[in-house]
């Protein structure tokens, strides 16, 4: 029996699944840290912080930056900085700075992963409704989808500000299934991180885990999705469609 024969709709995560957003996110994080005279983190480190929304991204960035600054000052024989504003207030300021800078660099710092457009197009042509579920702040989502020319594929889009509980809570996925008019078990959810797989399990949705995303440096198989794929277009044969041969480049 085909594991996905009862699927009537497909929903996707965004960052690390459909798009490589790390360059833009890392640039905005580092500009915000620099503006507060804190150490900058770099893309390789920021990648491990992506996936839980901007507020938690800021908390992780600030925690690391304050610790890094203390370590650097200690190696130079300087006392730790003891006149910081409270961390909660600093996170709030950092988030405002991040939002401003990310708005400037999001489009030029985000790229489609290979096979995204042709896979979405094939699924849409089959008549499957497609949804997007992301923890990314909602104001950034629609402009980014339009800039990448993939907004046209989605009938339902849920951003991080559209629900009270973000992934890994099931609420965003349940909302998408409801708007599609299908049961959760009829909606396949495709993601790259443990948050995605946990949300799918909690919602009762079958799940696909992709190996190429961020996932905090962990292997996706540790989250035990129903199926693991190396490439997004590996999904097509499982849904009765021919495997895409269109070789999209990351920078298309």
UniProtKB/Swiss-Prot annotation:
Mg(2+) binds at residues 13, 15, 192. It catalyses: 2-phosphoglycolate + H2O = glycolate + phosphate. Pathway: Organic acid metabolism; glycolate biosynthesis; glycolate from 2-phosphoglycolate: step 1/1. GO terms for cellular component: cytosol. It is an enzyme of class 3 (hydrolase). Its EC number is 3.1.3.18. The active site is at 13 (nucleophile). InterPro entries: HAD-like_hydrolase_sf (IPR050155), HAD-like_sf (IPR036412), HAD-SF_hydro_IA (IPR006439), HAD_sf (IPR023214), PGP-like_dom2 (IPR023198), PGPase_prok (IPR037512). Keywords: Carbohydrate metabolism, Chloride, Hydrolase, Magnesium, Metal-binding. One of its GO terms (molecular function) is phosphoglycolate phosphatase activity. GO terms for biological process: carbohydrate metabolic process; DNA repair; glycolate biosynthetic process. Monomer. Specifically catalyzes the dephosphorylation of 2-phosphoglycolate. Is involved in the dissimilation of the intracellular 2-phosphoglycolate formed during the DNA repair of 3'-phosphoglycolate ends, a major class of DNA lesions induced by oxidative stress. Belongs to the HAD-like hydrolase superfamily. CbbY/CbbZ/Gph/YieH family. This is Phosphoglycolate phosphatase. The lineage of its organism: Bacteria, Pseudomonadati, Pseudomonadota, Gammaproteobacteria, Enterobacterales.
